[in-house]
Amino acid sequence: MNQGNQAFENARKPFRRANLITALGLGAFAFATFAYSVYRVHEDTFEDVVMTPELEKKIAEDRDLSKKN
């Protein structure tokens, strides 16, 4: 069984570096996309969102409740 395991490891050896580089590249891309999204949302002021009086009242009530807790 040990000989089969050694053959398996030898067969995988040439692909380890390429697989690692690919995995790191995909991970870096995913992290960069997430970081960029957070950055863009953080700088948005949401001034273009229309607030109805009912919604403003509900938000004020929720803020008061969260301050009490």
Swiss-Prot record:
Domain of life: Eukaryota
A UniProt-annotated Pfam family: Coa3_cc
Induction: Differentially expressed during meiosis.
Mitochondrial intermembrane face of the membrane: 43-69
Positions of transmembrane segments: 20-42
Any single Gene Ontology cellular-component annotation: mitochondrial inner membrane
Membrane topology (Mitochondrial matrix): 1-19
Keywords: Membrane, Mitochondrion, Mitochondrion inner membrane, Transmembrane, Transmembrane helix
Principal cellular location given in the protein's record: mitochondrion
One GO biological process term: mitochondrial cytochrome c oxidase assembly
Membrane topology: Single-pass membrane protein
Subcellular location as annotated: Mitochondrion inner membrane
Function text: Required for assembly of cytochrome c oxidase (complex IV).
Subunit composition and interactions: Component of 250-400 kDa complexes called cytochrome oxidase assembly intermediates or COA complexes.
Membership in a protein family: Belongs to the COA3 family.
Name this protein carries in UniProt: Cytochrome c oxidase assembly factor 3, mitochondrial
Source organism of this protein record: Schizosaccharomyces pombe (strain 972 / ATCC 24843)
